[in-house]
C-alpha cells in the first residue's frame, strides 16, 4: 500500500451548499488524519479566512485560486465550455496534469461527471463512467452503481459497471470475492428488459467476478449481494427513494416515540444507543461521497448538503483509492475482459 504522505488530493472548496465554511474544515481534518497533501481550489481570500479561523499550523495545505464557480442552475455543458476558471475545472486540470492524484467535490454533480470525462478522461477501454454509492443493508454495505453518471446504457456498459463495482468492493470494503448482481424485475434468469438480459449473459461469462444473477428491488437491502448494477436512471431513482424513505421513517419514529406516554419515553431512553447506531447507519456522511469509477484519476462526488464529516470522509476515501491503487486494478479487470466488451458491441 502506498504511503499517504506521498498522495495529493485537490478539493473543490467552492462546491456544495455551504462552500468554504464547511469544505475547508473538513479538508483540514482529513489532512491531519491521513497526512496527505491537500490543494484547496477556490476563492483565495475566502479560503484563507477559513484557515485563519481554524488556526491551521503544520498541515500540508496549499491554495490554488479559482475566480469562478459552477452554479447549480447551469447546464453541465455550459460549465464545461464557458467556465474554464471555475473551481471544478481547475481541480480537474490538476489531476490531468499530474499535480494531484484525485479530486473531491460537493458541487454540481452533472458538471463533475462532464469535467471528469472530458478533462481527466476515461481509462482506456472504459466506455462510460459510473457513480458508485455505498448503501446500508441488514448485513454488510452494498455498492449500487450507476446512480446517475450514465442514464442511457448499453448492455456492455452495465457489464463494465459490474467489473468496476467488483474491484471497488474488493479494495474499499475489503471483500475477497464480492457477490455481484444486476437489478431486475425478477430473480430468475431471463427476467428483465432486453438491456438487462443481454448484460446478464455478458456478466455470466466475465472473468474474475462472482456474478450471482438478478436482484429484485425488494432485496437490495437484505445484504445478500455486495454489488448491484443498473443504469444511472434507475440507480438514481433507487438512491433518492432509499434516502427519502429512511429520512421519513426516522421522522415518523421520532414523532411517535416522543409524543407517546411516559412508558414510551422510558423505552426510548433505554434504547438510545440503538437509535444512535441506526442514525449512524443511514448517515451518508459516513462514507462521504460516491466515486466516479472509470476515470484516469480519482474523483469522489459528494452530496451537495455535505457537512464537515462528509468532506473529511470523502477525502479519506480518495486517499485510500490511491493507496490501494484501485485504478490500476480497474485497468487490469477491463483489459482481462476486453473480448467480452467487444462481443457486447457486436450484439
Curated annotation (Swiss-Prot):
HAMAP family annotated for this entry?
A: PlsX (MF_00019)
- Record Pfam families: FA_synthesis
Task: List the protein's name.
Answer: Phosphate acyltransferase
Superkingdom in the source lineage: Bacteria
Instruction: Summarize subunit and interaction data from the UniProt record for this chain.
Output: Homodimer. Probably interacts with PlsY.
Keyword Glycoprotein found: no
GO cellular component terms attached to this protein's record? cytoplasm
From which source organism is this entry? Lawsonia intracellularis (strain PHE/MN1-00)
Known function: Catalyzes the reversible formation of acyl-phosphate (acyl-PO(4)) from acyl-[acyl-carrier-protein] (acyl-ACP). This enzyme utilizes acyl-ACP as fatty acyl donor, but not acyl-CoA.
Amino acid at each position: 500500500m502506498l504511503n499517504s504522505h506521498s498522495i495529493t488530493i485537490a478539493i473543490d472548496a467552492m462546491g456544495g451548499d455551504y462552500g468554504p465554511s464547511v469544505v475547508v474544515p473538513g479538508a483540514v481534518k482529513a489532512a491531519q488524519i491521513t497526512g496527505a497533501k491537500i490543494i484547496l481550489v477556490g476563492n483565495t481570500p475566502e479560503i484563507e479566512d477559513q484557515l485563519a479561523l481554524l488556526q491551521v499550523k503544520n498541515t500540508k495545505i496549499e491554495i490554488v485560486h479559482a475566480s469562478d464557480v459552477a452554479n447549480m442552475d447551469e447546464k453541465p455543458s455550459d460549465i464545461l465550455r464557458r467556465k474554464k476558471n471555475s473551481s471544478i475545472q481547475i481541480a480537474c486540470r490538476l489531476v490531468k496534469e499530474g499535480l494531484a492524484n484525485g479530486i473531491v467535490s460537493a458541487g454540481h454533480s452533472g458538471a463533475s461527471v462532464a469535467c471528469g470525462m472530458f478533462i481527466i478522461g476515461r481509462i482506456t477501454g472504459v466506455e462510460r463512467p459510473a457513480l458508485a454509492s455505498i448503501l446500508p443493508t441488514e448485513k454488510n454495505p452494498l455498492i449500487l452503481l450507476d446512480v446517475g453518471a450514465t442514464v442511457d446504457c448499453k448492455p456492455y456498459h452495465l457489464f463494465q459497471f459490474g467489473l468496476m463495482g467488483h474491484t471497488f468492493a474488493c479494495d474499499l470494503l475489503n471483500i475477497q470475492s464480492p457477490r455481484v448482481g444486476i437489478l431486475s424485475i425478477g430473480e430468475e434468469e431471463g427476467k428483465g428488459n432486453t438491456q438487462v438480459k443481454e448484460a446478464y449473459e455478458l456478466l455470466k461469462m466475465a472473468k474474475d467476478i462472482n456474478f450471482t444473477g438478478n436482484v429484485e428491488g425488494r432485496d437490495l437491502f437484505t445484504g445478500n449481494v455486495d454489488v448491484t448494477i443498473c443504469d444511472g436512471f434507475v440507480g438514481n431513482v433507487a438512491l433518492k427513494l432509499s434516502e427519502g424513505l429512511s429520512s421519513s421513517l426516522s421522522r415518523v419514529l421520532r414523532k411517535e416515540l416522543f409524543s407517546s406516554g411516559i412508558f414510551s419515553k422510558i423505552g426510548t431512553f433505554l434504547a438510545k444507543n440503538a437509535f444512535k447506531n441506526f442514525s449512524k447507519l443511514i448517515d451518508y456522511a459516513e462514507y462521504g461521497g460516491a466515486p466516479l469509477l472509470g476515470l484516469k484519476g480519482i474523483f469522489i462526488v459528494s452530496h451537495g448538503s455535505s457537512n464537515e464529516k462528509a468532506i473529511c470522509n470523502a477525502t479519506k476515501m480518495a486517499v485510500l483509492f490511491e493507496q490501494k491503487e484501485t485504478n490500476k486494478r480497474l485497468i487490469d479487470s477491463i483489459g482481462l475482459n476486453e473480448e467480452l466488451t467487444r462481443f457486447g458491441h457486436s450484439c
